[in-house]
């Protein structure tokens, strides 16, 4: 499978007016968020579902992602918390004994916009040198409407994460142990409870 087959053009527009052209992946809806970078080599699924990345558009510096596919156990939260994803290249033929699907299928299912075939390290240097800024992933060509898009990006304010008002109680099965643990649930990663139970 060629990752460029049937791929639609997409653009990453920064609030300073910089525009990068690539190809869309996942949802075709526009996504506005705070542009940040991540230097991890693996763990893309955990990065996208980490509550700490709520409302961010994440730029991956590692040039290839998705080569081991996705599975439900790697999600740190029930839903993807990131707004969007910027990558260099994704693997259309992943291989792993735990794999349940490909990254493109995962993004479509979760309704998350992504863009690929960009120089993510150049974008990372821009963030590092110039600071964090808002950005937009869109499948609409910004030529002729860039000023309106930039105004929209600048006007976007990062919302308060939903977990600030998180009131749901979650109980884990009781284990025979002399210890009890209580966690204040601020939409913590699923793994925290799982790890507590395993020790």
Task: State what each model feature region is.
Residues 188-199:
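Conserved small/polar residues in nucleotide/adenosyl-binding loops
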